[in-house]
Design a protein with these regions (language model features):
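Membrane-embedded alpha-helical bundles of multi-pass transporters/translocases
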Residues: 2-453
Length: 453
């Protein structure tokens, strides 16, 4: 039986609707670049630029490790920042523009993998590493503001719905449109357009952001101790493992969709836009029902477990689909499950930050979101390794002009089985998550008492 949510009757909202919308709009600045990289980077460098598949898989793994390691470092620096503008906002003000310039260069590779594979690989590493370092800092600063600006459960789920309505737009742009725009305009122009939209969204949203007084005055915890305190936190460890499995499942979906539509469904790759758009629109439409009928009646833990179950079951339909109509319907089914995961991801992590605040007296959102980014990012390495291990066994070779018929089954398997396994493991892990029922209610009460002192 679902546990009734003890957090829905909390303190009145402390932010305005305008502030919540502005904060949410800025989410486009994170979503568009990351979704574009997740959805089409591998396709661009293998199928279009002809980087050998094994090289690409290894490069993505190295990139994922780098991305993982820089997350806690950036989070720690964000927590320690002291400035007139606060701890988080300066990073958004000054790094957003160079971040988007670096993103645009990802899609301007001047080398071909058949003639100059070494140079193409070097270019891949340089531009991707520069972009990723800047993007990690800005995204960590952005998400660290969420538990500080929005203090109670209803306010957080409200802003989460808004963020994810915006995120649906970002998913449509960043993950669904590349197949069309890259064909019509070319990859370089596509990258410039995406960078401009993301940059504008972040700067539009910054005026609605604020930091609460007092948190910047807290004494900083040394890096070693901060890492230790984070990694021994049971609530954090269980959530971040589940989140990693979530991003593994969704990474499979976005990475494989263009291959799946081309080689399994037999459709033009541009149908990827329609199938992903269908999934994201379904997710956007499902956000309100998820919040109203499930999240407001169940705790974050229960809601998240239900969302994993729906996502895992729906992934099976991708393996069974034949023809574009069935593939699109299957994608819509997956989108309904994703809506629950999208809604609760930042909300459940905010509860972890609250618990740590009560326990240590420190507001360490940067470290938690940074460490979360470190571990979650490893999911992309796992996706790349599964792709690199599985698809050559079904005959996929990026150097071939025509792929063998066996790749059909390979991509059906790639799109379904890993996601089912990931979602099942996530549910098992969340069974050990301690912030529910009486414990969660105690944390909320203690935090409210501290704020009222």
């Amino acid at each position: 039986m679902a546990t009734l949510n003890p957090s829905v009757e909390a303190v009145p909202a402390q932010t305005t609707s305008r502030q919540r919308w502005l904060y949410s709009i800025a989410n486009l600045g994170n979503v568009i670049p990351y979704q574009a990289v997740g959805a089409i980077l591998l396709f661009y460098y293998t199928d279009f630029k002809h980087l050998p598949v094994k090289w690409a898989a290894m490069a993505m793994t190295v990139y994922a490790i780098y991305n993982a390691l820089n997350n806690p470092v950036m989070g720690y620096f964000s927590d320690r920042t002291r400035s007139h503008w606060g701890r988080r906002i300066p990073w958004l003000l000054f790094l957003t523009l160079p971040c988007m310039v670096a993103f645009a260069f990802i899609w301007m590779a001047p080398f071909d993998g058949i003639k100059d594979p070494g140079k193409l690989l070097a270019y891949f590493y340089i531009v991707l590493f520069i972009w990723e370092g800047l993007a990690t800092m800005t995204s960590t600063a952005y998400y660290s503001l969420l538990p500080e600006m929005f203090m109670d459960y209803k306010e957080r789920t409200d802003v989460s719905v808004r963020m994810n309505v915006v995120q649906t737009v970002g998913l449509l742009i960043g993950a669904a449109l590349p197949a069309v725009l890259s064909t019509a305009l070319g990859y370089p122009v596509m990258g410039i357009i995406f960078a401009a939209i993301a940059c504008a969204a972040m700067y539009i949203g910054i005026p609605g952001m604020f930091e609460r007084k007092g948190y910047q005055d807290e004494p900083a915890i040394p890096l070693g101790k901060a890492l230790k305190e984070t990694l021994i936190n049971r609530s954090f460890v269980t959530v971040v493992i589940a989140q990693t499995l979530r991003f593994f499942a969704t990474g499979i979906l976005t990475t494989g969709m263009m291959f799946y539509m081309k080689y399994s469904i037999g459709a033009d790759p541009s149908w990827t836009t329609i199938s992903l758009a269908a999934a994201f629109i379904a997710a956007g439409l499902a956000l309100w029902p998820w919040r109203h009928f499930i999240a407001n009646k169940c705790e974050a833990r229960t809601t998240t477990m239900i969302a994993y179950a729906v996502t895992g079951v729906s992934s099976i339909t991708l393996a069974l689909a034949h023809g574009t109509v069935q593939a699109i319907l299957a994608a819509c089914f997956v989108g309904v499950g994703l809506a629950g995961l999208i809604l609760m991801g930042d909300v459940i992590m905010a509860d972890v930050v609250d618990e740590d605040d009560v326990r240590t007296g420190q507001r360490r959102a940067g470290m938690f979101f940074g460490m979360s980014g470190l571990i979650i990012t490893l999911s992309s390495a796992l996706v790349a390794q599964v792709f690199g291990w599985l698809m050559p066994r079904f005959g996929y070779d990026s150097a071939l002009a025509v792929q063998p018929a066996t790749v059909d089954a390979g991509f059906r398997l790639f799109m379904s089985v890993p996601s089912v396994i990931g979602c099942g493991l996530a549910i098992a892990v969340l069974a050990f998550y301690p912030l529910y029922g009486k414990r969660l209610k105690e944390i909320k009460q203690k935090l409210a008492e501290r704020q009222n002192q």
